[in-house]
Amino acid sequence: VRTGLQLRPLKSGGSGVQTYSKKHPQQMPTALEAGTLNGHGIAGLDAALDYLKQTGMDEIREKEQTLMWQFYEGIRDISGVKIYGDFSQKNRCPIVSFNIGDYDSSEVSDELFEGWEISTRPGGHCAPLMHEALGTVEQGAVRFSFSHYNTDEEIETAIRAIEELAQDEE
């Protein structure tokens, strides 16, 4: 920190340096540390950064895009499935949101987990205005988020599961 510049801590509280003092330490950098540092988080962040450098963001992005498009192509023509979003762009966020008929999104998500151990995020996704615009305030939507850790086989299983659920809804 530049000489003469005063920084105020975002939070203050216990300190590992002056444990029993009722006043927060004033010396830097301890003055900016409230409580115990998240050592596990710091170590995890370091490992994550090493992994990203080794694997490469381009490789990760390409894999996520490939899986997302595989999934989209696999469900887009299933009767009763309504997909939300702009799929006219080749590169997009590797997320697909959809509904199956009038099926509540939470029910679809539960069925996917119970029948196929597929984890999804149903509901309003902290985006009430989006759901208002889509007309899905009551139903919500089912969201698949793809990672480069997912496999082609997992995507094919998800497509088959959605086909089966859509048939059951008819």
Segments (PLM) and residue ranges:
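Pyridoxal 5′-phosphate
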Residues: 1-170
